[in-house]
Amino acid sequence: MSLSRVSVTAVRNLHPVTFSPSPRINILHGANGSGKTSVLEAIHLLGLARSFRSARLLPVIQYEQLACTVFGQVELAEGGHSSLGISRDRGGEFQIRIDGQNARSAAQLAEILPLQLINPDSFRLLEGAPKIRRQFLDWGVFHVEPRFMATWQRLQKALRQRNSWLRHGTLDAASQAAWDRELCLASDEIDEYRRAYIKALKPVFEQTLSELLDLEGLTLSYYRGWDKERELSAVLATSLQRDQQIGHTQAGPQRADLRLRLGAHNAADILSRGQQKLVVCALRIAQGHLVSQARRGQCIYLVDDLPSELDEQHRRALCRLLEELRCQVFITCVDHELLREGWQTETPVALFHVEQGRITQTHDHRE
């Protein structure tokens, strides 16, 4: 799948624009502050209904504008196309349109337009809180396991109910037991989906990483959020008093984590920023392979400032892996000459110059 047309209005410093990207490689180049990253942010908004640059919406909406909007036409892997649109206003409200109809949730966008982001903050996947790694894991499971979303919603409902009565004691014993049973059932299913996903991801990740970096001894493991030797029901019973004291459930899938270690150490404590970036690239490219296998389609990759922290050898290796995915890629850089030799002659590559918020398509960089 790929975006064949993108229209952006009132996103940061971008002038209203409609452009037609290449179905393969798109390089957006220009000076710092020209608006290159804002183009990626607009596409990210279209696919996930949120920004990757700010948790707050207001900075995304152009000054003195009431809302920002992004529209896109997606060429589907199975043929045909789908039209997507999103508008977000200053009050935080958003409207999603899919093929002319109102949609209820951002998950519907994500299903049609699976996006992968690689940017200078990618190291947070290794260094950041477990929540970031759970989001990475669950993004992957969502795109390969059709039952995941419904089970996830059951889990969240049961968890909210349990946490509410832990804080307020509003449920009788029978209701408490019923919600605990539902929580345990949904938790076991989520754990099963996650374990199956990690089992499929690990060999693809290891192979991908070996083409980017020689890191003997790097291991990827999964912690499910409670003792692997015990049933969750037993863990919840044991920790009930403590859960009541702090007002929330300590054990369960909401505490899961991915652990990357190099020997006896956390990988984030040992690796340089450049090495961390390559590890994250390998993880995200591996996810792309699994999406392709499960959906007979491809992710779309948003790569912000690709040359950052990578030498020429590693830039070329990363470009080669992205090219082998045969997917659509949007890459930003200051100097497109740094990426000139990264692609096969037959691969379509489109150049877009971004200057003061205006986007101009130039030419295939080999012309």
Curated annotation (Swiss-Prot):
Q: Which Pfam families match?
A: SMC_N
- DNA-binding recorded as keyword: yes
InterPro entries reported in the protein's UniProt record: DNA-binding_RecF (IPR001238), DNA-binding_RecF_CS (IPR018078), P-loop_NTPase (IPR027417), RecF/RecN/SMC_N (IPR003395), RecF_2 (IPR042174)
Please give the SUPFAM superfamilies that the UniProt record associates with this protein.
P-loop containing nucleoside triphosphate hydrolases (SSF52540)
A single GO cellular-component term on record: cytoplasm
Where is this protein found? Cytoplasm
Instruction: Say what the protein does.
Output: The RecF protein is involved in DNA metabolism; it is required for DNA replication and normal SOS inducibility. RecF binds preferentially to single-stranded, linear DNA. It also seems to bind ATP.
Against PANTHER family, the record matches this protein to: DNA REPLICATION AND REPAIR PROTEIN RECF
Protein name according to UniProt: DNA replication and repair protein RecF
What species is given as this protein's source?
A: Pseudomonas fluorescens (strain SBW25)
**Gene name of the record:** recF
